[in-house]
């Protein structure tokens, strides 16, 4: 990161790991902490910053991207604030947030074939949840995480739940399995509960223009 003209009396900041959380910390140390960019050291074992947002490659060697993050307008306020601090590489007068908004206005998600069965589009709007499933859902999101401890998702729902359209749409969106952590499931539900009515069309989903290394990590690195 380039030298910031604003400085304070802190000599140096060390950040362990080069993932998005560390890079965001560096941005705010420069912006709000008034620490010079040259006085921030990021300690990263890998030769590439970005953590799981480390997509890359070439036409000769192939490309690797460890998944993408689905954003939602109703949440991710802290991430969007970060976007608003970062100039767009192609057009520095605009920010990552400007480009994010522009792209999602141009390319709107509206899935027409959310589920397929026997080579035909299957009905997906009815999530198929019973009252018992709803009660289990309320319990799992209401309990403190230490109550869930090391339990699995399947410890909290009946076998019926895992045959519903809701589960098919949920697990294919967020790569969940019944044996995955109930705590992680709870966190995702709390983050994306506003998407429940839109699960069949994904109309609430928002994405970056390119893979998230090029759209998020590189612009931060190039500050």
Residue ranges of model-derived segments:
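Short amphipathic alpha-helical face segments that pack within enzyme cores
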Residues: 24, 28, 78-81, 215, ...
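Rossmann-like flavin
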Residues: 89-194, 204-207, 215
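Conserved FAD-binding subdomain of flavin-dependent enzymes
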Residues: 61-100
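Extended hydrophobic secondary-structure segments that form protein cores and membrane-embedded regions
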Residues: 12-16, 40-47, 98-103
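Glycine- and acidic
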Residues: 10-11, 64-66, 198-208
């Amino acid at each position: 990161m380039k030298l910031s003209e604003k400085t304070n009396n802190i000599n140096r900041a060390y950040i362990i790991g080069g993932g998005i959380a560390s890079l965001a910390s560096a941005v705010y140390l420069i912006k709000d902490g008034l620490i010079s960019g040259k006085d921030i050291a990021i300690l990263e074992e890998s030769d590439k910053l970005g953590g799981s947002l480390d997509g890359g490659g070439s036409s000769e060697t192939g490309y690797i991207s460890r998944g993408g993050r689905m954003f939602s307008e109703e949440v991710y306020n802290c991430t969007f604030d970060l976007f608003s601090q970062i100039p767009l590489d192609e057009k520095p007068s605009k920010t990552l947030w400007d480009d994010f908004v522009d792209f999602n206005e141009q390319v709107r998600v509206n899935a027409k074939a959310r589920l397929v069965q026997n080579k035909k589009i299957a009905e997906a709007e009815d999530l198929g949840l019973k009252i018992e499933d709803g009660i289990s859902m309320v319990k799992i999101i209401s309990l403190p995480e230490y109550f869930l401890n090391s339990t699995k998702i399947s410890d909290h729902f009946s076998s019926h739940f895992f045959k519903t359209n809701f589960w098919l749409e949920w697990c294919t969106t967020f790569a969940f399995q019944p044996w995955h952590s109930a705590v992680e499931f709870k966190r995702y539900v709390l983050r994306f509960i506003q998407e429940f009515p839109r699960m069949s069309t994904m109309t609430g989903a928002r994405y970056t223009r390119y893979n998230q290394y090029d759209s998020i990590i590189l612009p931060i690195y190039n500050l």
